């Protein structure tokens, strides 16, 4: 994209309802600026402009050892860009193969990154793949992939986004088939791998105590909309006091 197009995008993001300071996003030669602008445009529903910017990042190879104390790592920038490109391709063109390809790249990259992820759940990339398969009528394939993920993650107990999202998808599958009893059981199992605070424990207790299976499932769905705690613990900030 040319300088005029880039500056128009920067101006739109910097002057939006939730403005981002120009100094943080104006350098086109820093691909992380393009990442921020492109994703902000998508959030602002400027889909075509977002795709125009995000497409410039497809060939970028992120530094997999980059792990800043503040802000997103290069790996996270790339993963989030791929995620949003997949969403755009799916929503605008209904191109299943392209959308799944971008999500698979995002999944592989997030899985390979060895440092904490601040911005999203790594398992969300896998879940989005399953959701697209469901939308195109390949729900049985998605179910098989979710079950295979559970097999792959056997023994990885504790907080585990891959197991959580696999169980969540299977719970939704059973709900769609009219079996809320099984759906609620699967959702309860999913939350064994979800980061939960004391407030979350109370909410889950209420969900488990709901009178009917349908009410239990509905309550678990509500709990799934709340991020009670970060998915991954971050290292403590290093604060210099000798300046």
Predicted region positions:
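Terminal, low-structured helical/coil segments at or just beyond the last alpha-helical repeat
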Residues: 201-243
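TPR/TPR-like (Sel1-like) alpha-helical repeat modules
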Residues: 58-59, 107-108, 181-198, 227
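Flexible helix-coil transition and linker loops at the boundaries of alpha-helical arrays
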Residues: 19-28, 59-78, 92, 108-120, ...
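Structural motif corresponding to the intra-repeat A-B loop/turn of tetratricopeptide repeats
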Residues: 15, 44, 92-93, 136, ...
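"A position-specific structural signal for the A-helix of alpha-solenoid helical repeats
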Residues: 7, 36, 77, 84, ...
């Amino acid at each position: 994209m040319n300088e005029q197009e880039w500056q128009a995008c920067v101006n739109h993001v910097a002057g939006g309802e939730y403005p981002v300071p120009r100094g943080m996003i104006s350098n086109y030669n820093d691909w992380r600026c393009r990442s921020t602008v492109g994703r902000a445009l998508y959030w602002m529903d400027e889909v075509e402009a977002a795709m125009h910017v995000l497409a410039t990042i497809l060939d970028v190879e992120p530094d997999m050892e980059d792990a800043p104390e503040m802000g997103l790592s290069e790996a996270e920038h790339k993963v989030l860009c791929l995620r949003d490109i997949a969403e755009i391709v799916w929503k605008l063109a209904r191109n299943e193969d392209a959308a799944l390809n971008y999500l698979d790249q995002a999944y592989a990259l997030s899985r390979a990154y060895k440092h904490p992820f601040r911005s999203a759940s790594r398992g969300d990339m896998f879940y989005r793949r399953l959701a697209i398969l469901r939308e195109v009528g390949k729900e049985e394939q998605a179910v098989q992939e979710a079950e295979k993920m559970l097999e792959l993650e056997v023994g990885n107990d504790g907080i585990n986004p891959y197991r959580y999202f696999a169980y969540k998808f299977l719970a939704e599958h059973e709900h769609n088939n009219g079996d809320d009893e099984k759906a609620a059981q699967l959702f309860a199992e999913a939350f064994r791998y979800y980061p939960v605070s004391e407030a979350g424990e109370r909410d889950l207790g209420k969900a488990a105590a709901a009178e009917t299976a349908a009410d239990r499932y509905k309550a678990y769905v509500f709990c799934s909309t709340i991020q009670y705690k970060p998915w991954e613990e971050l290292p403590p900030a290093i604060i210099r006091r000798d300046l």
